[in-house]
């Protein structure tokens, strides 16, 4: 069984730090081997808009789009996608490259409708989405 590379997409700017706890949870899952065949690619490990800044927006855009193309699937936190242009671009890029998009979120009133429409399936929680990825995509 090969590793399933999963790109983590979701709002970074204009949301508080607590909102990023879902990314921390993904790292915890990977580091502790809970799902040994899942590998998370988190773009904010490279540029996080606070202390890790790109030299240009093009540099950031090119890297993130390239990372998406190297992944098997995109996992998107849809909460606050209505204020995140970058999340929308990541989702659209994955869609155009025929990369499956799996969504999750609990605050539907903060979702950008077009982002949600691009998802193959949407779950309420991160845990359920990860279990689905492991049981479905990682077993191929």
Range-by-range predicted roles:
Residues 1-140:
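Conserved catalytic or regulatory cores that recognize and/or transform ribose-phosphate-containing ligands
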């Amino acid at each position: 069984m090969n590793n399933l590379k999963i790109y983590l997409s979701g709002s970074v700017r204009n949301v508080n730090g607590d909102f990023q706890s879902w990314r921390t949870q993904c790292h915890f899952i990977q580091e502790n081997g809970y799902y040994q065949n899942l590998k998370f690619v988190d773009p904010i490990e490279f540029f996080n808009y606070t202390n890790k800044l790109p030299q240009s927006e093009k540099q950031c855009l090119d890297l993130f789009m390239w990372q998406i193309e190297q992944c098997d699937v995109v996992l998107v936190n849809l909460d606050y996608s209505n204020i995140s242009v970058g999340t929308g671009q990541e989702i659209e890029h994955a869609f155009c490259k025929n990369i499956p998009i799996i969504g999750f979120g609990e605050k539907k009133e903060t979702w950008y409708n077009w982002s949600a429409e691009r998802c193959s399936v949407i779950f309420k929680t991160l845990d359920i989405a990860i279990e689905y990825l492991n049981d479905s995509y990682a077993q191929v």
